[in-house]
A protein has these predicted regions:
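Hydrophobic alpha-helical transmembrane segments
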Residues: 3-38, 43, 51-185
Length: 185
């Protein structure tokens, strides 16, 4: 892999996994306590390990993959909204982030992964996705974002800042939910 491809793949992974690693576990913990977060991560890890896209696990992995899509549906959209807030806070390109989000958020085969990828790509002015080789096989991915500039090492820093800030906002959101549930129940 060339340097720019490594950078692009890293940014793409951080952006996509903002939901899986942070916002969704926080969201499900807010609703069902720590067990909700643990159960979500368990389903997500099983999906990532034996998802139905390989012939070996087609029968076993289909259910966890679909369940992960369902469990991540609301958190992915919350993550995109929180990430857009963080884009503004970090003084990145919020206008482009919103435009790319509106245009590209449904481009991925997964109903959830392009939500945060599109915000991140727009905020950084880069393009994610495209055809790449993994393990010697061509994998076709939809193009997300506008190629306003080439990927640079600094983009990894900003993608991580978006992940961390979005996680912080998710924790604040969770505190509000848990407090509301405490007084309602």
């Amino acid at each position: 892999m060339y340097k720019r491809q490594v950078i692009k793949s890293t940014v793409e992974s951080v952006a996509e996994n903002t939901t899986d690693w942070a916002v969704a576990p926080i969201f499900w913990s807010a609703i069902f306590g720590g067990l909700g977060g643990i159960l979500y991560r368990t389903v997500n890890i099983i999906d990532n390990t034996v998802g139905y896209k390989t012939d070996t696990y087609i029968n076993f992995g289909k259910f966890p993959a679909k369940l992960d899509d369902v469990l991540s549906f609301i958190p992915a959209r919350i993550a995109a909204l929180l990430m857009k807030m963080n884009v503004s806070y970090l003084h990145l390109d919020s206008k482009n982030a919103s435009q790319v989000y509106k245009k590209d958020r449904r481009k991925s085969p997964s109903p959830n992964s392009a939500q945060t990828q599109s915000v991140c790509a727009g905020a950084l002015g880069i393009q994610l996705g495209s055809d790449e080789y993994y393990g010697g096989q061509l994998v076709r991915k939809p193009v997300i974002g506008r190629n306003l500039k080439p990927c640079e090492p600094n983009d990894i820093f900003w993608a991580n800042q978006l992940l961390l800030g979005t996680s912080f906002y998710a924790m604040l959101f969770t505190a509000v939910i848990r407090t509301a549930l405490f007084f309602v129940i």
